[in-house]
């Protein structure tokens, strides 16, 4: 597994570039389908957002999700998968703190 986070040239927008080696071979459609499924239900609902719309760093500023999965950038080659997730490193973090406080109170 390998990854990098890059702060984009805007005040708060960033992107994560994550590369993983999986036990089984997958294709782009399988990866994107799984991320879409997880984003719409379960523990990551409201935290992970799935999109197939083209994004730029300024689209992320003010976004409350911890990660916006950019399906247009997904790559798969056998066991290797590369995915990208955009996030507003200030606002998304603040929203998760509010979530935590709501659980504690």
Where are these regions (language model features)?
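C-terminal substrate-binding/catalytic lobe of Rossmann-fold NAD(P)-dependent oxidoreductases
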Residues: 1-81
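NAD(P)-dependent Rossmann-like dehydrogenase/reductase catalytic/cofactor-binding core
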Residues: 64-105
């Amino acid at each position: 597994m390998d990854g990098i986070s890059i702060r984009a040239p805007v005040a708060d927008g960033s992107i994560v570039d994550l590369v993983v080696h999986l036990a089984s071979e997958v294709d782009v459609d399988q990866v994107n389908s799984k991320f879409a499924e997880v984003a719409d239900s379960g523990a990551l609902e409201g935290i992970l957002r799935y999109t197939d719309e083209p994004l730029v760093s300024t689209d992320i500023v003010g976004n409350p999700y911890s990660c916006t999965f950019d399906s247009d950038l997904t790559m798969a080659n056998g066991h290797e998968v590369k995915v990208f997730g955009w996030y507003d490193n200030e606002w998304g973090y603040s929203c998760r703190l509010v979530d935590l406080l709501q659980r504690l109170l």
